[in-house]
Amino acid sequence: MIARRRFRHRLEYGAVRGLGALLVALPHRCALAVACGVAAVVYALASGRRREAARRVRLVFGESLRPVDVSRICWTSFRNTAFNAVEMIRIRKLSLAQMEEMIPELPAAVASLRELMARTGGRGLVVALPHMGNWDLAGSGCHLSGLPIFSVAGRQRNPMMNDLLNRLRSGHGMDILERGGGALRQILERIRAGQVFAILPDTRSPTPDLLVPFLGGAANLARGMASFAYAAEVPVVPIVMRRRGWRHFTLTLHEPIWPDKTAPKAVELERITKTVATIVDAAIHETPEQWFWYNRRWVLDPVV
């Protein structure tokens, strides 16, 4: 069993590296075209994942969407995920000028974040980036712009793929902490030292936490994002990224959510988490095809 698993891991790693080498060698738009074709084949074959994504979309939007609209949302979300992978595989080839051409609002966003950091007395920020646009690319763009940004990621089952993903995510030097161990302490220390912590706020916590209204249901969201902001006395800044066409993006910075240290901690953690969830909910309803509907942990599933 162990030998079979190792063989499968090597096969997966080899296939990804081989395809990755091709995508790096091609011009950017050609690489996206290849990814679009591969995504179309996989999408046609992955009927179970496709049906589950459609079920989720219908659960959120009910009868307000036609079947053709549901299909469009599911396909665009899937295709954009393939595009995200291409951009991360090619991340080392992207200069700051190219990043700013792809994300025109990047310089203004970084400037706004720096202004906020100047108001925290030498501390950093917590940035809430939902699964929209290319959230990894947004973090890399901020780091390439000189912003001391870092994030945390879970460990993949395939150790070779885990190392590869971390190398890609840190392609321009962005620090990635591995979830678990002493990561929680490190996150708080880094924020207090003036770094920016980027976190995905729209994933279901695997253990009971805060039940928050989200997408027409109740989502069990982790209070960690709000806890770090409260403990470090820094704001949470929700940022929504959207793909425009094949290779361009928009960035929308929402008003910072400052913790109120005079209020009870539990009340503040719930308020901050709910405020971010409301912003993300509105963004998903506005452009549902931009959100990632294929997460294995569906955000509205109850915690068992």
Where are these regions (language model features)?
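Catalytic core of membrane glycerolipid acyltransferases/transacylases, capturing the structured
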Residues: 122-181, 204-210
